[in-house]
């Protein structure tokens, strides 16, 4: 049937625009968290932000052949320890596994970015190194941040049937990162987190 687009606009346009808006909002929120995390670094810690994958700038297309494939978001060193941090934000009380592990490939039956977390866990197996997924549950009654070991995320994937990680599980298996709000932005007690990780290393 003929449809005059001037009087009968594409009914899918609104949904598409809303989806693009949500993606942009998520990206902006994630970038704000990363910026706040870096500004929260103690002065005696070296912090390097690894470059984003090209997929981040092309609508989340994870199959780009020229896409950079970094192990995590932040590489941090403070004597005597080396830390890997992957940062994630979510506005719901439970974060989908695809938000951490990438798109699930039904043909291969695995997550696209599973190797990132696997490599992080492997790195943390060496003395003096840690690897954590830092999850910021930033909306509603939760509004808390937890550093969850990469190995614990893998254990969750292999032992749980849920396709998302609730904040209660993150609180139980991770380390809470204290936070406080400035006028607009947030600051995180990264120094306190590093101290706890150093103490855990000393007691290992």
Whereabouts are the PLM-identified features?
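Catalytic phosphate/metal-binding cores of nucleic-acid and nucleotide-processing enzymes, i.e., regions
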Residues: 1-204
